[in-house]
Each structure stands twice: as C-alpha cells, then as structure tokens.
Amino acid sequence: MNFELKNFNTIRINKNQTILIKTTNLENSSKEDTYQFILKMLKAGVHFGHKIKKWNPKMSPFIYQKLQGIHIIDIIQSYTYLKKACKLVYSKSLTDNYNTFLFVGTKKQSPIPNSIFYHASRCNSFYINNKWLSGMLTNWENTTRSINTLKYLKVYQKTNMFSKLSMKTHSIIDKKKNRLEKYFGGIQNMTSLPSTVILVGQHNEITASKECRKLGINNITILDTDCNPEFVDLFIPANDDSSSSLNLILGELQVAINIGRQKFCENLKTWKNSSSILKQI
C-alpha cells in the first residue's frame, strides 16, 4: 500500500481512496519534520484500528473515519500524543533514578512480547512480557522475595555443592529457577518500584494498569480502537497489533529514554567538574 501526503488535510492511499485527517491540534514547530514523521507513521500502519464491530465507544474522539469495515485512527492525534509521551519519558530519564522504566506486554501469539523485550533491552529498562502476576507491584515485598530466590538459585547452580546433588534434585531446582526466570527474569535487577510503566495490549494488562493507578505510578499505554482511555494517565491512540506500528512507537519512547539519560550523564559530568556554590547547598 503506497501512501502520499497531498497536504495536511488528506492522505491519498491509492487512486480511489483518500483518508481525511485533522490538523487543528498540529503544532507549528517544523512542518517538514512533521510531514516526514506522519508519513513514517502511515507507512508503519499506526492509523489502522480494529473492525468496526469491535470498537469501544470511549475511543470515539480518537477515531476519524471508517474505511472498508475498519476504524481509522486520527493520525494527527497519534502523533501529538506520542510526542507528549516522549517528552514525559525524556524528562523522567533526566533524573538520577537510572532504571525506572518498566515495559509490559504479554499478549500471546502477537508481536507484542518480542517488541517489549527488544525495546526495553535497547534502553536498559525492565520488562514483563510473559505474564503479569497479580500483585507484581502492589505486593512488592513478595515480588522482591521471588527475585531474590531467582538470584540465589542462579548462583547456587554454579557451586560445587549443587554439582554433588542428585539428578532428581537438579531437575527440581531447574524447574523452580526456570519458572521464576519466566515471570521475573525481566525485572530481576529492579530494586524498587518503577516511576513509569509503558503498557501494550490493554485487554491483557488490566491488572497491571489498576496496580499502577493504585500506587500512583505513571502509566503510558498504546490504545487501539477497542480500548478504554479512562484506565490510563497518558495514552497513544494507535494500532497495537502490528509489529511495524509497535516498533515505531516503542522505538521512539526508547530513543527518548536514551537521549534523556545521555543528557543526564553529560550534565552530571559538568556538575562534578564544577566549583559552583550550588554544590554546597
């Protein structure tokens, strides 16, 4: 499918089909940069929603039109909300709490788990991409206990004492370690609650979303046309089923985190080499 941005009011998909888009909320920063980025979003399929019969009416403000039986997401709002989310994670990453981001997406038989793992790893963040266990955040003491057990078993398996155990005992320990690795491997180095959770696949992550709200943790969620925007602090209306759409959005968030951390390190170096009186306060 070839896209052409005729101007900031229409998108021509082919000779016979044109999608209209809103421009009222579009920032006047750099028209050319915005033009190119929106084109990039369109090529990634960010604007494709679900079939009309599967929609959630609460997503109505973010749906612009119907096309061939599916809802088309307002691409300008997708762009605007993605920009807001990137600004938030960038500002968060400027602090000295280095590992404060948790990526969550566990929907099986979808590109979500792989995208979550890839982009979390690229910005040295934590992730849960297998299953969200109830109380993962709200019962942090129990989660920490499981993480410590996982770490202990990993070390124990390398000792001479472990090598002397029977094969049956080896099997029991392996199964326990593998189970803990499955659920806690992506957060095994997380020593405290995250400041920001990035969620993909809202229907599968309702428990995670509720735990974030209960604890006052910032929650950024990619919302497709079948989702509910009332459950999250900040959301990005976008296609959450396509790997190209997910990789574009999560990739931008990942880059924003890395740039913020790089900026923090540069400022920290300048700060340490400074003789400013502010260091005495």
Curated annotation (Swiss-Prot):
GO terms for molecular function: structural constituent of ribosome. The keyword Ribonucleoprotein applies. Belongs to the universal ribosomal protein uS2 family. One of its GO terms (biological process) is translation. Transmembrane segments: none annotated. This is Small ribosomal subunit protein uS2c. Its main location: plastid. InterPro entries: Ribosomal_uS2, Ribosomal_uS2_bac/mit/plastid, Ribosomal_uS2_CS, Ribosomal_uS2_flav_dom_sf. The gene is rps2. It comes from the Eukaryota. Keywords: Chloroplast, Plastid, Ribonucleoprotein, Ribosomal protein. SUPFAM superfamilies: Ribosomal protein S2. The keyword Ribonucleoprotein applies. It is found in: Plastid, Chloroplast. One of its GO terms (cellular component) is chloroplast. It comes from Bigelowiella natans (Pedinomonas minutissima).
